[in-house]
């Protein structure tokens, strides 16, 4: 009930005030988190380009073999399929990182609101209602 909510509120205020000494500390932490995620996206996109180029090269080689009447080895086809799977996984990682950026913004906005609380009279802000 109310006691549990008050305890949770006090713990949140203590946690945020121990982590951050000012609003600008929160801004800086958010900036760092977003930069880290953006770097992960850039690296994953580079990996995706590399894997896509490998797959396209394998597909061209397979087409050349086929046109010249040579059989295409199963391992070759497996490598193409493996590259396609890697591409799908990398695209999914990129989507997840973009979603994570939205979550980070909401998380730090919540931290800002908790940081501003002087007491727990009105309880914690609702995480879902904190503007992003």
At which residue positions do the language-model features occur?
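Long, low-complexity, compositionally biased polyampholytic IDRs enriched for Lys/Glu and Gln/Arg
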Residues: 1-11, 42, 88
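Extended aliphatic helical segments
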Residues: 13-16, 26, 42, 51, ...
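Short, flexible coil/linker segments at or flanking structured domains
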Residues: 22-25, 39, 46, 64, ...
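Charge/polar-rich, low-complexity and marginally structured segments
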Residues: 25-54, 58
């Amino acid at each position: 009930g109310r006691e549990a909510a008050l305890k949770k509120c006090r713990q949140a205020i203590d946690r945020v005030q121990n982590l951050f000494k000012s609003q600008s500390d929160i801004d800086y932490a958010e900036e760092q988190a977003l930069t880290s995620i953006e770097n992960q996206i850039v690296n994953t996109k580079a990996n995706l380009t590399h894997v896509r180029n490998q797959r396209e090269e394998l597909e061209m080689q397979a087409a050349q073999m086929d046109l010249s009447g040579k059989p295409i080895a199963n391992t070759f086809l497996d490598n193409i399929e493996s590259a396609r799977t890697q591409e799908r996984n990398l695209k999914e990682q990129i989507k997840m990182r973009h979603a994570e950026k939205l979550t980070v913004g909401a998380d730090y906005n919540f931290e800002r609101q908790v940081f501003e609380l002087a007491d727990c009279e009105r309880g914690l802000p609702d995480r879902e209602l904190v503007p992003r």
